[in-house]
Amino acid sequence: EKIMQRVPSPVDMTDPELWRRPGAHFGDWFSEEIPAGQVQGTGSIMLFRHADVREALSDSRLGAMGTQALESMGWSGGPFVEWMRNNIVAMDPPAHTRLRALVNRAFTPRRVAELEPLARRVAHELVDEMLLSAEVDFHDAFAQRFPLHIICSMLAIPDIDHGQMQLWTEAINEATGLPSESAREAADSALAEMVEYVGSLVEKRRSSPGDDLVSGLIHAQEDGESLNDTELSAMVIQLLVAGH
């Protein structure tokens, strides 16, 4: 209640000017040590202070809310909403605990250790590409491509499909926050295509397992349980979106 008494008027998080000059909008709040801000259109609260964030994350009275935020914006159906219903980041215990335990089974110490040489190789390849141009945008040429390339490699997604993965994940990420109608439509279209692609990928790994993360997720077990097809698809897509 003390925090809410000092929360300023709501902020439109979809305003491009906000992200072009965030310091001009948030600077006064931070300098005055205002602890939180409201997100216009959702009733959501942004916490700014590390201690408050840690306390909120450990408070059992607070939860992930599932798809409630989407529904509050009138987005109640379609591929994006369905994906979020099965997305680990939108779940609370015990569902979240179960999925996390299964996914952790697939991220073995050996698999994580093998990422270092892969990461070095990909980084060198991207830097070599950058050196061929007189001027480059580091974000577009490296920062955006590097993590997605690593995740795609872990999932054994062919190099030829990496560009399509980037387009899909860009559309999905554009739909987070307070998306426009066109952004919602693009995200739904991207999710529908990704679900089909990932479904085919899972079927291939079921019939011909490899030493990749998809195969690891398929065969991961915890207390006799494993991921079903819907959970597998949602998890693989979440890894790709997180790696964007």
Model segments located where?
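Central I-helix of cytochrome P450 enzymes
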Residues: 144, 148, 152-153, 194, ...
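A residue-level signal for conserved active-site and pocket-lining positions in enzyme catalytic cores
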Residues: 49, 103, 147, 198, ...
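Alpha-helix boundary/capping and short turn/kink residues
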Residues: 93, 112, 159, 207, ...
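Cytochrome P450 catalytic core segment centered on helix I
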Residues: 126, 167-225, 229
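Active-site substrate-recognition loop segments, prototypically the cytochrome P450 B′-helix/B-C loop
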Residues: 1-139, 151-166, 170-180, 185-189
